[in-house]
Amino acid sequence: MVLTLLKAKPERKLAKQICKVVLDHFEKQYSKELGDAWNTVRDILTSPSCWQYAVLLNRFNYPFELEKDLHLKGYHSLLQGSLPYYPKSMKCYLSRTPHRMPSERHQTGNLKKYYLLNAASLLPVLALELRDGEKVLDLCAAPGGKSLALLQCAYPGYLHCNEYDSLRLRWLRQTLESFIPQPLVNVIKVSELDGREMGDAQPETFDKVLVDAPCSNDRSWLFSSDSQKAACRISQRRNLPLLQMELLRSAIKALRPGGLLVYSTCTLSKAENQDVISEVLNSYSNIMPVDIKEMARTCSRDFTFAPTGQECGLLVIPDKGKAWGPMYVAKLKKSWTT
């Protein structure tokens, strides 16, 4: 049940294979939800040779020579100066072509100079608008890219990175150790709590909360190596919105009145995105949506957004020359009255 990808070069081994079970499932769902846009999205998602990788520079071990080299290679700075909130301390570079820098190896005691990521994953971080001294919770933090990006934006008074999965928690710890200097580690707490329990454990504690929720993860699901497991995942997919809603309820409890919450996923699924946010807004009188449409207008040079069906959020969809996403982002504010 696997469709083989065409080789980029004849002598190379096949790096990835598309799982037909997943592709057929996505075809049925997303052709309805995205309309004609799905054709381009599908072409990008099923062609890893088209994928792009952004380079997030580490301000704690700044690679000046690498930055010069990126400029020479035609990379440009992400969104610099185009958003009301874009910290000068955060430097991320993009290439219009699908070029990937080599990953740095983890070496104990040596900080890495850069982190490779899907550029769209920085939008939830920017939407959170973290300021120096604030208490922030990254509820589902592994593998750590968004926690790392938050620390490129500001010096929080307290950063709580939580991850329930023990294997992913190890990955999170290694990411933080690889990029963050020891003095700053003192303001970071890493925990292994079920995210659904965080609100009861730390009620009204945080100024800002990021919920980068477990989701269908369309890019990786398309390349599932085991068709039977993929079919099982698809059948269990209907349970994800319930989990996402429970995580959001917990996050809202943990958020102080007046605080901001950003919800994000890396799936195109309306059920896991807009429908979840709509349910939250219908369930809480003290939770209000924050309009982030301006982000789409100012980011259109680097990202393509789904044109319809995103009343309370933004959905980045992969496009030709802008192969970023999927990434859904919604921003909420907790009022002082209940």
From Swiss-Prot:
Q: What is this protein called?
A: tRNA (cytosine(34)-C(5))-methyltransferase, mitochondrial
Query: Which segments of the protein form a coiled coil according to its record?
Result: none
Pfam families given for it? Answer: Methyltr_RsmB-F
Q: Which gene encodes it?
A: NSUN3
Q: Is DNA repair one of the keywords UniProt gives this record?
A: no
Name the species this protein comes from. Answer: Bos taurus
The biological processes this protein is annotated with in GO are: regulation of mitochondrial translation; rRNA methylation; tRNA wobble base cytosine methylation
Output the InterPro entries linked to this UniProt entry. Answer: MeTrfase_RsmB-F_NOP2_cat, MeTrfase_RsmB-F_NOP2_dom, RCMT, SAM-dependent_MTases_sf
Checking CDD domains in the record gives:
AdoMet_MTases
Protein's cellular compartments: Mitochondrion matrix
Q: Which UniProt keywords apply?
A: Methyltransferase, Mitochondrion, RNA-binding, S-adenosyl-L-methionine, Transferase, tRNA-binding
Name the enzyme group at the top EC level: transferase
EC number(s) on file:
2.1.1.-
Record's catalysed reaction(s): cytidine(34) in mitochondrial tRNA + S-adenosyl-L-methionine = 5-methylcytidine(34) in mitochondrial tRNA + S-adenosyl-L-homocysteine + H(+)
Record's function text? Mitochondrial tRNA methyltransferase that mediates methylation of cytosine to 5-methylcytosine (m5C) at position 34 of mt-tRNA(Met). mt-tRNA(Met) methylation at cytosine(34) takes place at the wobble position of the anticodon and initiates the formation of 5-formylcytosine (f(5)c) at this position. mt-tRNA(Met) containing the f(5)c modification at the wobble position enables recognition of the AUA codon in addition to the AUG codon, expanding codon recognition in mitochondrial translation.
The record ties this protein, via SUPFAM superfamilies, to: S-adenosyl-L-methionine-dependent methyltransferases
